[in-house]
């Protein structure tokens, strides 16, 4: 097992290689489904890199759908409802997230904590997913904070969408 290692990018396959109940704390800051394309700034070390935060069914690892259907039928029903009510892109996003959160539950110790960082785009869906995977009784709290941005615009500055959410189980 890796010790004191930080993994970036898609974590699904890394988690599948880990034993059950070995992790004390998980903090995740996943994509928010913002429907935007993010490009690294020109001149930065990451110049030329980009991240597409728009989700389709191509982003879902279909090999793990059978496990979800067998072990989390109410979660699958919820995901289907979101697709019917909202749209197929949100359905793809929350399926993608559910597959990873299921693995996180498996590797998290019984007395471990998980902090999910998100914004209002899908926080309400992610909270229900966490309830269905971890159980409603394991919900601890939500933490909200408003980020403060410094601007030279003085009183003309109007912050937008700076509230961040942490869902804790």
Predicted regions and their residues:
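Core catalytic lobe of class I
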Residues: 1-169
């Amino acid at each position: 097992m890796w010790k004191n290692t930080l993994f970036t990018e898609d974590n699904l396959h890394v988690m599948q290689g880990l034993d059950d109940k070995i992790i004390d704390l998980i903090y995740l800051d996943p994509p928010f489904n913002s429907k935007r394309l993010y490009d690294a700034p020109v001149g930065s070390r990451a110049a030329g890199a980009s991240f597409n935060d728009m989700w389709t069914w191509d982003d879902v690892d279909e090999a793990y759908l059978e496990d979800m259907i067998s072990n989390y039928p109410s979660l699958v029903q919820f995901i289907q409802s979101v697709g019917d009510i909202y749209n197929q892109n949100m359905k793809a996003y929350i399926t993608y997230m559910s597959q990873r959160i299921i693995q996180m539950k498996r590797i998290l110790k019984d007395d471990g904590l998980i902090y999910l960082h998100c914004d209002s785009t899908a926080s309400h869906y992610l909270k229900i997913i966490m309830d269905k995977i971890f159980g409603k009784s394991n919900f601890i709290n939500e933490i909200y904070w408003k980020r403060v941005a410094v601007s030279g615009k003085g009183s003309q500055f109007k912050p937008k969408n700076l509230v961040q959410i942490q869902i804790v189980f």
